[in-house]
């Protein structure tokens, strides 16, 4: 009887132990995909350089998460297209005197990751959101602090979502 009571706890412990074991590896990726190209992001916002910043951070994240997938400038066996849909910088919190203490930068994108060999979509995401908060009270007076955090968050989300589709 005691053994039956302990079974759920043992199963839960085993599940928790295995949570950190999954990673993307060459055996997880489809064998027919060896190269990926990342097109420059289409930028529909008033932030002229934001599309370039978004695109530039993705190759390094891919190298970390999917090292067997080689990146090429064009005509990859897999292809990424990203559209930067919106960019906002809004007050996030106020201090006791009523002035803004923190701002939140938010970036919203649409993503399509295609398999050009099989001519099918691997992953499509619409309205993916990354945000970054920067604090005036911590001396972060420039929007760039929030942009950097928002870009890192959205880039990681894009890569994780695309690779989890495999």
Functional labels for PLM-detected ranges:
Residues 26-31, 124-134:
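Mobile beta-alpha loop/short-helix "lid" or hinge segments that flank ligand
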